[in-house]
Amino acid sequence: MLLAIDVGNTNTVLGVFEGRRLLDHWRVETSTRRTSDEYGILVRQLFTHRGIDPMKVTAVVVSSVVPPLQSNLEKMSERYFRVRPMFIGPGVKTGMPILYDNPREVGADRIVNAVSAYERHHAGVLVVDFGTATTFDAVSPKGEYLGGCICPGINISMEALFQNASKLPRVEFARPPHVIGRNTVHSMQAGLVYGYVGMVDGICARMQAELGFPVKVVATGGLASLVASESKAIHQVDEFLTLEGLRIIYGRNHAS
């Protein structure tokens, strides 16, 4: 079995594969204060809770945008699963040319998403990932990573409103009953939801015009479904895009 770990700034998503089949997945808080033993015990408890034997894990692959966690995840993998993890980064075969001024600058999660989306569609794609940052990544019909946009994430924007406007409360990112809010909470929700929908549709339209070829727009991330339900640009939501990309890239580096 393959344990795939996607470490984001806010959350860490784990998935366990048996061959091409995703057996289960979990989302936990990303914490640089958690030790390697704490991570190991947590992951083994998640496995046990779902009736999965952790001793059947034969490989671990990690995509991380939090460098301080690399050492702990490496120790966790070696101690609790007895395997050396593969980290997505320079030197790893992705099968995708990266046409970026400095390819080393591109976040591992963005490349993993691009590989996963292209593998599924084999056409021009735009990937919109609603994480701590909201990212847009373009892939050519030839499977080349072209670049993209990085915007403040939804939760960052909500927290900024709360922190910097003393009379505004924290609100849930949820669809309000009307675009024209009739109270403060609904007004903030309208601005956040429809503001992000407008941003997504606007950036996708501009990127498609610049690319000059048709693209499939694929969204992923915890808040993707809500935005996609109001968006005119998003064609598909793929909750497991990053985990599948990790599986694909691991396979390309360990072909039997």
UniProtKB/Swiss-Prot annotation:
It comes from the Bacteria. Keywords: ATP-binding, Coenzyme A biosynthesis, Cytoplasm, Kinase, Metal-binding, Nucleotide-binding, Potassium, Transferase. One of its GO terms (cellular component) is cytoplasm. ATP binds at residues 6-13, 132. Pathway: Cofactor biosynthesis; coenzyme A biosynthesis; CoA from (R)-pantothenate: step 1/5. Belongs to the type III pantothenate kinase family. Homodimer. This is Type III pantothenate kinase. The gene is coaX.
